[in-house]
Amino acid sequence: MHVNGRQVMAETHAEMNSDLELDGGQASGSGETLDAPPKKRRVTYWARKQSHPLYTRICLSKDWDERRATLMAIRMQKLQSAYHFIVARCGSLDQPSMRYSDNRFETEQGDLDCDCCDIQTFEGVKSLRQVYDAVMFFMANMEISLSERLGHIAVRDDYAIEDNVVYNSRVILTNSHGVTAESSVVAFPHLFAEGDPAFGGEPCAVLAMDCIDEDELYPYMPKERVRRDASTAIVLTVSQHTPNLSEGGGLVDVTMRRAGFMKLHRPEFPISEGGLQEVHDSITAWGAVMIETIREMVYSQQ
């Protein structure tokens, strides 16, 4: 389904409350290596997604021009917030022994919250644009990748805003237990091929993504679907590649830094324990599928 789309109200909350009161009265914020299992705790208080630096409250009316105007108005702010958050959040992971952090919390309301970040390196690729194009290919075809790699039934509805500038889409995913989850997402991509002083001054690419809170035209269906919200950021940077004997010259290394906050809302309909567990287990699966898709696409072109 492809229709034109635009947007209407946005409020940005730029501060993040980091004081988490756990059952033991302790704060949480530990990172794990790639091989370590993610932590999951019961919390009595969790910094709401509304206070996350990557989150902007976005409400959509039925008017296409208003929808578009609001998204375009917040685009640059979203890109800047994404870039600066990644620089601050992923700095502690910039070492071989610590490239991944995944913290999960179950709220008193029964929601599952996940705060995570990771660093991936695509070594010996042709260019920054090659990896950026692979990221955008995944974004434009994610329902195919999710269906193939997760074995779920995925459907994506596209509400075009501005090609290569702003994208709005809804993804509906049904797992093997017959439980359906939905996400309504807006994405702001940009490739700074020549660099920009506001984004580090060196060539880079930024992708800021956020959830839609309310949509008068395409409302959530909480009595039938589990709502999945995500406020995430991706930054790509490029560096010189050291070739091995079998490689030619002119290749580069592209580093992807990702961070975000995700929430699975408590289902408002009957659901089996197995079905709910599968939904919870898949909270970060989309990110893993993205990396697999990008690697496959980039290295098949070498």
Task: Show where each model-derived region lies.
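Eukaryotic helix-grip
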Residues: 13-15, 19-24, 31, 46-302
